[in-house]
Amino acid sequence: MMELLSNNSVPQQMASSNAPSANNVAHSSTANGSGGGSVSSNASNSSERLLAGILESFPAWDLNVGLLPNVGQSSPPRADFFINNFLGGLDTHGDFSIGPIGSGARSNPKMSPESSNNSSISCGWCEVSASIRCLECNEFMCNDCLREHRNSPLSSNHSIVSLPTPIGASPTGGSSVNAQTPPSGNFICDIHNEMLRYVCDYCRKLVCQCCTLHEHKEHSYASIQSFMVGSKEKLEGAIESSQVGTRCIKSSIDKALAFIRLIERNCSELSDNIRKAFRQFIIAIEDRERFLLDFVEKLRQRRLAILHDQMAGLKSALAGLSETSDMLSKVADNACNMDQIEIAMKLTNGQRQMEQFAGIYKDLQPKQEVFAFAPPDYSLLQDIRNQGGVILVDDKNLPIVSSSNGIVPSVSSVNAVAAASVGVVGGVAGVVGGVGVSNGLDLAFGMNMPNNPLSVASSSVRRPLLRDNSFRIPSPIMQPRGGSACGMSSGMSSAALDWELNGLRSSPGLHFSAPRTTQAIPGCMDLVKVRNSNALSLSFATEGHEDGQVSRPWGLCVDKMGHVLVSDRRNNRVQVFNPDGSLKFKFGRKGVGNGEFDLPAGICVDVDNRIIVVDKDNHRVQIFTASGVFLLKFGSYGKEYGQFQYPWDVAVNSRRQIVVTDSRNHRIQQFDSEGRFIRQIVFDNHGQTKGIASPRGVCYTPTGNIIVSDFDNHCLYLIDPDINDILSVKGHEGSGFHEFNRPSGLCCDDEGRIIVADSKNQRILVFNQNLDFMWDIEVRPSINPLMPPTLDEKDRTCDVAIMPDGRIVFLIELSPDSKEGSNPYKRFVHVF
C-alpha cells in the first residue's frame, strides 16, 4: 500500500536526515530493503497480540453477579509503538530518502489536502507529482522537496507520511485490470477525511493514519488485514458473549422484579409489626391509667361510705342526746313532785347515756384524708420515644431461597436473622432514635410472611372495613411465655399453626394474665387431637320435650370430663349428658329472669368449668357454675358496646376472654371473664359478595386467634383480636372440598386442625392447619351408610365439638321446612 520512512524510530530517522545527500540516498535504499522485513515482522507481532487476546477482548459475564469489568493485563505501549504497529499494516512501494530542503512559500496543491487519492496531487513546492505529506504543515511534497523540508530547523521533527496507492492502481504504478470502486463515505474518517485503514484495539473502532499519530497515538492497533485474521473465531466469540450477556441482563431484570415484590411485602410487614409492637405500649399505659382511675373511684366510694356511716352514727347520737337532755330537763322541772329514788334513777341513766354518746362522738370523729397523685417518671418518655427501630439484615447472613422469578431472600429467614442479630424484645440493641445500627446492620424488620397463598385474602376480595371502637379493662402486664413468637409452649408444634402464622406473622407481648395458647377443651390435661374415623360410635338425644330429649337444638360443647353440653333451643334449657349419652342434669326455663332463656344458642366451657350460654332472643350472655347455678349475665338489645342483636355463638380462650358473634350487628365482640367489654370487630359489608351479613360460628385457635364462619358469604375468617385485623379468608359458595354452603359451628383441636359444620352441604369438614382438606363426614344416609337410617336427607349439621379422646361430636338440626315430631326415633347428637 504505502511506505513510511523506515523501521527505525523517529529520533533515529531524524538523526539520519543530517547525513550528506549521497549517504542519504544509499541509506534510503538500504532502509527500503530492510524495511519490508520489519514491516512484515511488526504486522505478524501485532496480529499475534490481537489473536492472543480474542477471548479476553469480550466482556466477562457472571450469571450471579452481572457484568464484570474485564481488566486487561497488558501495559501501555511504548512511545514509538504506534510507529512500529503502524508499519505492520503498510505495503511499501517506490523509494524515497530524506534530505535537506529549503523553506519558502509554495503554491497549494491542485487538490485538497484531505483527499486520499494521489493520482493528480502535485507537490506544493515544485509542481511535481507528490509522494509524501507533512502532517504538521498539511502540505504535499515530492521526495526532493522533503529533503529541503527536513533541513529546516523548524520542520526537522515533523511527522511525514507517504500517500496511499491510488485506488485501482498496482503498487508499482501500473494500471489495474480490475479497477475497484472507490470507497463510500461510510469508510472515511469523520475527523481527518482519510480512509479507515486500522483497528484500534483499545477503543474498538476503525481509525485512519492520522488518528494513529494523534488521537490514538498511545493505543494499540493493527491493520484491517491483520485484524481480519481469525475473523470467524472473533464473530463466534462476540455472538457467544452477546448471548451470555442477554441471559445475565434478563436474570438481573427478573431479580429486580422479585426484589420489588419483596420490598412491598416487607414494608407492609414492617408497618404491621410497628403497629402491633407499639400497641402494647399503648395498651400498657391504658391499663395503668384505668387501674389508677378505678382505684381512685373505689377510694372515693369507700371514703364516702365511711363518712356517711359516721354521719349516721353522729346523727343517731345527736338524737339520743337530745332525748336525754329533754328527760333531764323534765326531771329538773318536776323534782319537787318526784321521789328521791326516781330522781336518782333518772339522773344516773342520763349520765350513762351521755357517756355513751360522748364515746360515739369520739369514735365517729371525721378525719381529713387527702391523697395526691404521684406522677410517673417523665424521663421514661424519651426512652419510649427511642424504643424500637429498623435495621438492615446483613446480606452475608441472609439465607437465599429460589423463586420462579429469580433468587430472592426468604422473608421468614430474614426475620430469623434479624432476631438473632438483635436479640432483644421490644427494641433493638444499640438503637438510638428511630433508626439504629447494630453490629454493622443499618435497618431491621422482624415479621414472618411465608409464601403460602392461603395466608392472605385474594387480591380481588375487598377486605371488611374494621372499626377500632374499643377499650380494655384494667389488667396486669405479662410477657409472653414459651419458646415461640406467639408465646406458645415449646412442646407445641409450630408446623401445626402455619395458616395462622402465614397471616399472623408474629404475636406481640400479652397484656392479660395468661399466655395466648388456647386449649381445644379448656382444662383438659391431655393433648386433644382429632382423629379420622368413619365409624359411628354413639348417638343420643331424641326429639321431644322430656328429659334427655331436644327440640331444634343448636349449641354444643364438651368439658374436660367428656360431658356433652347441648343448648336445647326450643325447650329453652341446657342439658348436660354423660360421655355415654345418658342425661346428667339440666337447667333453665323460658323467661327473661336470671337463669332463664329465650332460644339459647351457642355454648362453651372455660378453664374454671363455668358454663357460658348465649341467650339469643334475650340478646344477652349468661354464665353458670359447672352445676348450672346462675352467676352473672351481661348484654342487652342494642347496637352500643356490650349490646347485642341476636347473638349466636360464643367461645372462650385461656385468658378467659369471651368472644360472641353479634349476627345482626355484623360484628364480633370480646369481653373479659366478668362480662366487661374489651373490643369489637365490625364488618361493614365489604366481603367477597355482600360482606359478613351474619357471623355465625366462632372459635379460638391454639394461638389465641379467632375463626368466624360467615353464614351468608360461605367462608371463614381468621382474625387477630389484638390488632383488630383479618389475617386470612378461606372459602366460597359451593360443594367442593374447599367450598362451603352456609358454614355454621366450628372448633379447633390442639394442633390447629379445624373442624367445620358445613350446614347446607350436610357434612362435617376437617382441615389441617393450612386449611387443606383432610376428610369429611357425610350425614345423609344415602351417601354415608354408617349414619342412622332414621335421619332425614334434609337434616343439616349445625355445631361441632371434639371429645377428649379425639372423637368428633356434632349436632343435627332440622331443615326449615321439616315438620317437628315426624320421627320420634331420630337422634340429634352423633359421635364419630
From Swiss-Prot:
GO cellular component: muscle tendon junction
Tissue note: Expressed in ovarian germline stem cells (at protein level). Expressed ubiquitously in all epithelial cells during early stages of embryogenesis. Specifically expressed at epidermal muscle attachment site.
Protein name as catalogued: Protein wech
UniProt biased composition (Polar residues): 1-14
GO BP annotation list: cell differentiation; instar larval development; muscle attachment; regulation of cell-cell adhesion mediated by integrin
Modified residues (Phosphoserine): S107, S470, S475, S506
InterPro entries to which the protein is assigned, alphabetical: 6-blade_b-propeller_TolB-like, NHL_repeat, TRIM-NHL_E3_ligases, Znf_B-box
Misc. remarks from the entry: 'Wech' means 'detached' or 'gone' in German.
UniProt keyword Nucleus, yes or no: no
Binding site for Zn(2+) 2: C189, H192, C211, H216
Subunit structure: Interacts with the head domain of rhea and the kinase domain of Ilk. Interacts with AGO1. Interacts with mei-P26.
PROSITE patterns (UniProt xref): NHL (PS51125), ZF_BBOX (PS50119)
Pfam family, one: ANCHR-like_BBOX
Classification of source organism: Eukaryota, Metazoa, Ecdysozoa, Arthropoda, Hexapoda
Deleted gene: phenotype: Muscle detachment in late-stage-16/early-stage-17 embryos.
Gene symbol of the encoding locus: wech
Annotated region described as Disordered, given as residue ranges: 1-42
Low complexity bias (residue ranges): 15-32
Annotated function: Vital for larval development. Plays a role in tumor formation. A crucial component for the physical link between integrins and the cytoskeleton in the epidermal muscle attachment sites.
Superkingdom in the source lineage: Eukaryota
Zn-finger (B box-type) residues: 118-163, 184-224
NHL repeats: 537-580, 584-627, 631-674, 680-722, 727-770
Swiss-Prot/TrEMBL keywords: Developmental protein, Differentiation, Metal-binding, Myogenesis, Phosphoprotein, Repeat, Zinc, Zinc-finger
Residue positions binding Zn(2+) 1: C123, C126, C145, H149
